[in-house]
Amino acid sequence: MSEDKESDVVGEEEESHVIKEDKELNDASNETLTENGDQLLQMIAELRLENDFLRSQFEGLKDEVAQGRSLQKAEQVEADSAQLKQLQEQVASLSREIDVEKQTRVAAEQALEHLREAYSEADAKSQEYSSKFSQVEQKLDQEIKERDEKYADLDAKFTRLHKRAKQRIQEIQKEKDDLDARFREVNETAERASSQHSSMQQELERTRQQANEALKAMDAERQQLRSANNKLRDTIEELRGSLQPKENKIETLQQSLLDKDQILEDLKKQLQAVEERKQIAVTELSAKHQKNLEGLEAQVVDALSERDKAAETISSLQVLLAEKESKIAEMEAAATGEAARLRAAAETLKGELAHLKSENEKEKETWEASCDALKSKLEIAESNYLQAEIEVAKMRSQLGSEMSMQTQILSTKDAELKGAREEINRLQSEFSSYKIRAHALLQKKDMELAAAKDSEQIKSLEEALKEAEKEVYLVSAERDRAQQDLQSALASLEKELEERAGALKDASEQIKSLEVKLDSTVARNQAEKQAWEEDLRVLEETWRRRCEALTAQNEASPAEGIEKELENAKLRNKRMKEEHESVRELADRLIEEKDREISRLVDEMTNLRKSMESKPVWNKSPSQVHHYGNNNTESQQQDVSNLSTSAAEHQILILARQQAQREEELAQTQRHILALQEEIEELERENRLHSQQEAVLKTELREMERKQKREGVDMTYLKNVILKLLETGEVEALLPVVGMLLQFSPEEIQKCQQAYHSSTTAATTTEATPSPASEGSGLSVFSRFSFS
């Protein structure tokens, strides 16, 4: 700065000397010299203004560099040190040039002393020139004032730019706060997902407990049924040992058996209804399980979409940062730290999003494992239920076999009763015949007594009477014993019948209790099934809503969002390229203008030298004066050229720095564009993977739905449809029905239709002449088969 001031003072002194020298020159030479002097003064004033402006810019850049040094890294410090070394070298070269200029100035001062002695007569003209010079000074003062006003405007603009930069930094801080808020929201969603996961685990534990309780209840019921079966077996064995019923009680028992058979048929119907309900419940459970899987996949896709949205926000923020960095290139030194911090925050957000994605995948795997465990538990419960039903069926078959055995035993007892009755009738007939014979004997003996006259005959007859009475007494005793035996047998049979009736009552009561237990178990199973259905319905509704939202997002957002991102990235790339081209063109324009100014100044210097060298020499003293004047003008021209070259070099340095900054900014923007392109490629790959996964899941869902629908198909109706298809050959009419019943996929239906059309076309081409076989082929499909 001091050297510039000294050069300015020396320039002013030299200008005054030049004015004094020009007083004694010719009018033409005076006019040319005054014109040249005015031009030089204007050039000097312009160069001074430019020099001051460049100094102010250089000072501002120094301040910015001083502020940015605290934020720059080691590489920037090394670069600044290299630049400082270059500047020191330039300063040394400039100091050497200044020394040379001082030497020339000393020689010029010596020449000026000679000129003062020679040009003492030019005082009048010098006064005129001094008045002109005062006017010029006034003009210079005015220009200085205008320059100060311009500087004030520039300072105001700089303050406004500084305020805008501060506002932009505040906006970036707000955007960072928004990002933090979004990150908190993502964390909250993750916490909600974890809470939902814990609630689902609790529900799974509750369902496990319920399943265990149901299994325990089924085991207890199984034990009760076994104990009841054992009791029934014992009672049946007791009944087998004591069954001799009467006919009326046998009829009542047969009627009760018929009633029991009816009850058993009702129970079979109820069991069939329970089995149908069980199948419906299993289908509903599988459907709900599938919907749960779909809901879990929807949650995973929601998390991925949130991750994609966060990535989009990060990329948009990065683009905004890049644009703002390009707009405030001069303030980038102050904002690089903040941008780096934001980029680090964005990278941390990306890492956290990847972590969230991995956690979501782990949660999905855990959900799938839990669903598989639930499936296995459901299968175990179903197998236990089937085993219980099998055991109930076995018990029913055993009861039926035991009832058949009881009926056989009753029939045998009936046969024994018939034999006993026949024996009683035989004994009664024998007793009556014995009575008749005894009465005939008595009559015969009476006749013999009446006919006998002798005592011996009477005595013999009396003895015979006594023997007959004894025999009658014995027969009556035997009859009494037989009657007592019959009465005791009848009493024992009555007792056995009463015991059997009591046992049958106990058995019927046990059967009723078993029926009540069965009804209670069925009601409990139905209540549990209803509770499960309610829970599954709620889960199905939630997962269905999520699946619908996911499908809507998958159908609407991914392709459009990626295309929009690609278009935005392309537009940003074009915009940045255009800005780079405009900046490069502006820099090239400025460099060309400065080159033109430098070439113009060099041409003017050469012209001045030529004009000064071409001046005539008048006499010795004038020759000395001329020589002295030439030296003075040459020194002045050297000073002007030095000033112009130093200003031009300084401006070139500033332009070079600006160009380097712009190139660095361009490299940063190119790197940013490459990063954005890589992110776009990653997003495209992820979108392709998501679409593939979505297609696979959709196919699996459709296949599972078709399997579930196949399970509820009426096989008799399917059999009739297939028989009608084979009999009539109406493939076009009955193929959709078969496809609906068996849940064919669209590809399978197309294959069947293509095969049918190809077979029909082949038949029409091969069978040109009609034949019975061809006539039958149009009516049924059986004609295509050969039956041996």
UniProtKB/Swiss-Prot annotation:
Keywords: Coiled coil, Golgi apparatus. Golgi matrix protein playing a role in tethering of vesicles to Golgi membranes and in maintaining the overall structure of the Golgi apparatus. Residues 1-15 have a biased composition (Acidic residues). Changing Y717A: Reduced interaction with ARF3/ARL1 and loss of Golgi targeting. The C-terminal GRIP domain (711-788) is necessary and sufficient for Golgi targeting. Residues 620-643 have a biased composition (Polar residues). This is Protein GRIP. It comes from the Eukaryota. InterPro entries: GRIP_dom. GO terms for biological process: Golgi vesicle transport. Interacts with the GTP-bound ARF3/ARL1, but not with the GDP-bound ARF3/ARL1. The keyword Coiled coil applies. The keyword Coiled coil applies. Residues 763-775 have a biased composition (Low complexity). GO terms for cellular component: trans-Golgi network. It is found in: Golgi apparatus. Signal peptide: none annotated. Residues 30-615 form a coiled coil. The gene is GRIP.
